[in-house]
Amino acid sequence: MSSPHRASTTQQLADLSLTEGEHDEGKPLSIDYLQGHEGLIEEVLKWSEHEQLDFMDKIVHRLSHYQLGKVDNFIRPMLQRDFISNLPAHLVELILFNVNSDSLKSCEEVSTSWRCALARGQHWKKLIEKNVRSDSLWWGLSEKRQWDKFLNISRDMSVRRICEKFNYDVNIKRDKLDQLILMHVFYSKLYPKIIRDIHNIDNNWKRGNYKMTRINCQSENSKGVYCLQYDDDKIVSGLRDNTIKIWDRKDYSCSRILSGHTGSVLCLQYDNRVIISGSSDATVRVWDVETGECIKTLIHHCEAVLHLRFANGIMVTCSKDRSIAVWDMVSPRDITIRRVLVGHRAAVNVVDFDDRYIVSASGDRTIKVWSMDTLEFVRTLAGHRRGIACLQYRGRLVVSGSSDNTIRLWDIHSGVCLRVLEGHEELVRCIRFDEKRIVSGAYDGKIKVWDLQAALDPRALSSEICLCSLVQHTGRVFRLQFDDFQIVSSSHDDTILIWDFLDAPPSGLPSSTNRATLPELPNQAAVARAQMLFEMAARREIERRDREVVEEPALRPRANAARRHNADIAAAAAAAEAARGAGDNDESSSEEDLDRVDQVNNPNVAGPAPPQPHNQNHRRRQPRPELPVRLMQEMAAFDNMRRQQNNMDHLGGGDVDEEMPDGGP
C-alpha cells in the first residue's frame, strides 16, 4: 500500500509535467505520455524515500533553466505554507504554547492572521503564567507588583481589570476579538516590564545596591537579637532579654511580646499554627501564633538549647549538652521525644534535616550525618579547623560556616568538600543558600553574598564567587534569612535590618540609608592605624620621661621598663579599641567546649603562668606612679588578655574565644 507522502509526490510530478507540457507545446499532452506516466509513477512509489530523492535529483539536473524556475514557483508556496491558518485550532494552540518570548515577538510580525491567532490564544498571558508556576522569582514578583490579579482568572474579569487599569470605559460593549486584542496588547507589554524587573533585581544583588529599613529592637535589658524568621506580614525575633518580639511589616512596630523564657531566646521557628523557641534556660516552649499563649514547655536538655528545626510532624533540637533530640509532633500539645542522638564531643550548635538525613554541626569541628529512617550515624564531614557555628542542608548540598572564618560546601552522599570560601575576617555565624546564592553573616559585622553556581564550578576563580559585601550592622551578625528580593538580618547591635533589592534606588544614586552614610566597622587596617598612633604617643611619653630622669640615674631602670612595655601598650590599645567597637560582655556561639570559657573567665581556675620577660634574670619593676593612668590601665588590660589567651591555648584552643555569660550562642 502506497504512503500518502508517495502519492503526493507522484501527483506533484504529474501536475508539473502537465503544466510544462501545455506551456511548451501549446497543446494537450501526447497519448503515449498519458498512457505511460501512470505506470512510471506507480513504479516510483515502490521505491524508498532515499531512492525517490535520488531519482528527483537526477531529473532536476537535466532540466533547463526555465523548467527549474517553474519548479521553484511550484515548490516555494508549498514550503511557505501558513500552518497557523491551515492547522486545527488545538494544534496551533499546542505549538504556540511551547515557543519562547522571542519567537512570540517574531510571530506577531508575520501577518495579521498570526497576530489574531496569538490574541485568541492569549499566549503572552500563558507564557507569563507558565513562568509564574515554575519560578519562585516570577511568583514573588507577581505578588509584590500586584499583577498576579491579572492571571489565572476568567476572560471577562481580565478585560474588566485591564480596562480599569488603563481607565477605559468598562461599560462599553466590545466584540470578542476586540476584547482579546486588548488583553493581548496588555500582556505583551507586561512581559518586558517583568523581564526588566528581574534584570534589575539580579544586578542589585551583584552590586550590593539596596534600600535599607532598620528596626530598632533596643530595650532596657536587650543586648542582641539572636534569631528571627519572617514572612510578608511579620518578623518574629528572639532576643537576649528572654523575650520573643513580633514586628508588623506594615509599619515595623512591635505588635506582640511573648514572655516566659528565663534565659536568652537562642533559636525559633514558626508555621501557621505555632512558634517553637529554644533558650539558654534549657527549655523548648511552644506558643500559639494567634493568641501568643505558651501552650507547652518541653524539658529535656540539661543545658542551653542552641538550635531547633521542625517539619512534617518531626522536630529536632540540639544543645550545649552535646546531644541531639528527635521529637514526634502529633499536635502542638502532644510532643514526645523519640530518640536522643549522641556522638559529638562538644556543644551541638546547629541541626537541619529532611526525609533522608539529619545533619548536625558542633564545636568539635565536625559535621555528622544521621539516617532519618533508622536514626543511626552515617558519616562524618571533617575539614574545618575550628568549631562549626552554622550550616544549611538541602538536596545533596551542605553549606557550613566556622570560627576558622571559612565557609565549606559539602556533598552529603560522598562526604567530599567541594569548595572552601574565604573572605570573612571573623567567625561565620549564620549562613543560608538557595538555587542561586549563598548569603553569610559573621562576627566582623559583614554580610557577604556568594554565587552558588560559581562556587560549585571547579573552574571558577575565587574572585568570581563573592558578589558583594554588605556593611550596615555595627555589631556581630547573629542570624539572617533571605529570599529573591531581600535579606533580613539581626545583630548584637539590637537591630533588625531589611535589605531590599527589589525597590533599591538606581545604581549610583545614594539612598537615605545607603551604606555610604554609615561608618564601617573597625577593620584590621583601622586597628593597625590606632595601634600605630598610640605607639607613637607612648614613645613620645617615654622619651619625655627619659629626658626628665637624665640627671637621676636611679630612675633610669624604670624608664627602661616602661620602654620594654611599649609594644605591649600598643597592642593593648588596639585590643581595647576593638573591644569598644564590638561591645562588652557579648555572647557567642560555636564553642568547642563551652565549659572551658567559664574556666578561662573564672579567676579561681588555675592556668599556666603568663610569659616571663626575655631576660629571665631581670625582675619586673612596677611602673612609676607618675605614669599616665591610661597607660597603666591598658597595660593591666593587656596582661589580663594575654593570661586568658594562654589559658585558652592550654585548654586546646580550636574554637570561638569569646565570653558567653548566658551560655547562649
Curated annotation (Swiss-Prot):
Pfam families in the cross-refs: Beta-TrCP_D, WD40
Superkingdom of this protein's organism: Eukaryota
Key words of the record: Cell cycle, Cell division, Cytoplasm, Developmental protein, Repeat, Ubl conjugation pathway, WD repeat
UniProt WD repeat ranges: 220-257, 260-299, 301-337, 343-380, 383-420, 423-460, 472-509
GO molecular function: beta-catenin binding; phosphatase binding; protein dimerization activity; ubiquitin-like ligase-substrate adaptor activity
InterPro entries on file: Beta-TrCP_D (IPR021977), F-box-like_dom_sf (IPR036047), F-box_dom (IPR001810), G-protein_beta_WD-40_rep (IPR020472), WD-F-box_domain-protein (IPR050995), WD40/YVTN_repeat-like_dom_sf (IPR015943), WD40_repeat_CS (IPR019775), WD40_repeat_dom_sf (IPR036322)
Location relative to the cell: Cytoplasm
Main location: cytoplasm
Biological processes per GO annotation: cell division; negative regulation of cell population proliferation; negative regulation of centrosome duplication; neuron projection morphogenesis; protein polyubiquitination; proteolysis; regulation of cell cycle; regulation of proteasomal protein catabolic process
Residues annotated as domain F-box: 81-127
Region (Disordered): 574-665
Transmembrane stretches, start-end: none
Compositional bias of kind Acidic residues: 584-595, 655-665
Assembly and oligomerization: Part of a SCF (SKP1-cullin-F-box) protein ligase complex.
Function: Functions cell autonomously to negatively regulate cell cycle progression. Required to restrain cell proliferation in response to developmental cues. Probably recognizes and binds to some proteins and promotes their ubiquitination and degradation.
Full protein name: F-box/WD repeat-containing protein lin-23
Source organism (scientific name): Caenorhabditis elegans
Source taxonomy: Eukaryota, Metazoa, Ecdysozoa, Nematoda, Chromadorea
